[in-house]
A protein has these predicted regions:
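Conserved catalytic SET/PR domain of SAM-dependent protein methyltransferases, capturing the structural core
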Residues: 1-126
Length: 126
């Protein structure tokens, strides 16, 4: 499988969060409702494939009751915030991150991690 995103509205750079690693930023001003698809691989929860990809458990998105999406592109670069500018939108087995507000160019994009991910990254105490 070749992951070849053709998305040109974003770039990856050092996060504005101290010790946050890299983050996802806008190259241009964007409007509320603009969105992009989180590209990746779907695996069944608790399957052999899920167990074999445990190294990325903290980054998996739950899609419905039985599926997990392992992000392979820019969707996996958005960091956590309790005041996010992105929300998750599901369409069947597809996941999109959608802007919840207008943002200027060079804005870092955030969504709120699940409680599981917040705990795994040590964010619940912060």
């Amino acid at each position: 499988m070749l992951i070849d995103e053709q998305e040109t509205r974003f770039y990856v750079a050092e996060s504005t969060i101290p010790d946050g690693g890299n983050g996802l930023f806008t190259k241009e001003a964007m409007r509320r409702g603009d969105r992009f698809e989180v590209i990746g691989v779907l695996v069944r929860r608790d399957s052999l494939s899920d167990k074999c990809t445990h190294f990325c458990d903290h980054h998996k998105f739950r899609v419905g009751e039985d599926l997990l999406l392992i992000p392979m592109g820019i969707g996996g670069m958005a960091n956590h915030s309790l005041t996010p500018n992105l929300s998750k939108v599901f369409e069947g087995e597809r996941l999109f991150l959608e802007l919840t507000e207008d943002v200027p160019a060079d804005t870092e994009l955030f969504f709120t991690y699940t409680e599981y991910a917040q705990e795994a990254f040590g964010l619940l105490d912060k």
